[in-house]
Amino acid sequence: MLFCCIICSVLRKNSRAHDEIRPVKIIRGWNIYAEGSALIAFGNTRVLCNATFQRGVPPFLRGQRSGWITAEYAMLPRSGTERSDRESVKGKISGRSHEISRLIGRSMRAILDRYALEENTIILDCDVLQADGGTRTAAITGSYIALYDALVWAKNQKILSKHPLTDSVSAVSVGLVGDQIFLDLDYSEDSNAQADINLVFTGSGKLVEIQGTAEKSPFSYGQFEQMMELAKTGCQALKEIQAASLD
């Protein structure tokens, strides 16, 4: 018998229900120079996502007639409650930044027809302007918009014959806080969570990636199933917001 987590009607910060994402706002074309860009807000978390279209591919793909998407993720020095040095000053990219950069790239490639992109590369730069939890999920959700617009640009420039995306993609966090499962954790909730998971879904509901950790105590498989379903619902809501912004 599956363990059933207690879900009550206690409201969270900003009167959110347990299954409610934060207010999401997307501004397309925020950067006038990038082929595609989006400033995305998940509540107080804000991430600028820029997509750069470049001719050519990395050496390992040359001659294969397929394209590539890669990403870089970074946080501005004062994106959090205290200032942190830039990684360029430290002379080393943190393990966290490297991990999230790779996650964003994998998430975008999951919905890409690489052969339709031909031998071209798109670089996604995700810069966290303000962090209040969920920066990686916001970066993935916003990167899809920037990527979409960069590919539209390439098609309009007659560089590509068709749009290479096969689906949409978004991401959301879910966590066990006290006796409740919460969707889209802010920083205060994430800091107090017994367990939290970041999930990436395509618009058609297929799972791209799961990143989960029992931060303070193990959780049951039943709780995991509940968190999965809640995250899928959250990503469907994000899919609708993405579609509205592209309409």
Curated annotation (Swiss-Prot):
Q: Which UniProt keywords apply?
A: Nucleotidyltransferase, RNA-binding, rRNA processing, Transferase, tRNA processing, tRNA-binding
Query: Recorded E.C. number(s)?
Result: 2.7.7.56
The UniProt catalytic activity note for this protein reads: tRNA(n+1) + phosphate = tRNA(n) + a ribonucleoside 5'-diphosphate
Q: Which GO terms describe its biological process?
A: rRNA catabolic process; rRNA processing; tRNA processing
Named from the GO MF annotations, one term is:
tRNA binding
Name the positions where phosphate binds.
Answer: 96, 134-136
Q: Give the Pfam families listed for this entry.
A: RNase_PH (PF01138), RNase_PH_C (PF03725)
Q: Could you tell me which InterPro entries the record lists for this protein?
A: ExoRNase_PH_dom1, ExoRNase_PH_dom2, ExoRNase_PH_dom2_sf, PNPase/RNase_PH_dom_sf, Ribosomal_Su5_D2-typ_SF, RNase_PH, RNase_PH_bac-type, RNase_PH_CS
Q: Which top-level enzyme class is recorded in the Swiss-Prot or TrEMBL entry?
A: transferase
Quote the function comment for this protein: Phosphorolytic 3'-5' exoribonuclease that plays an important role in tRNA 3'-end maturation. Removes nucleotide residues following the 3'-CCA terminus of tRNAs; can also add nucleotides to the ends of RNA molecules by using nucleoside diphosphates as substrates, but this may not be physiologically important. Probably plays a role in initiation of 16S rRNA degradation (leading to ribosome degradation) during starvation.
Q: Which NCBIfam families match?
A: RNasePH
Q: How does it assemble?
A: Homohexameric ring arranged as a trimer of dimers.
Please give the family membership noted in the entry.
Answer: Belongs to the RNase PH family.
Under which name does UniProt file this protein?
Ribonuclease PH
- The organism named in the record is Tropheryma whipplei (strain Twist) (Whipple's bacillus)
Phylogenetic classification of the source organism = Bacteria, Bacillati, Actinomycetota, Actinomycetes, Micrococcales
- What gene does this protein come from? rph
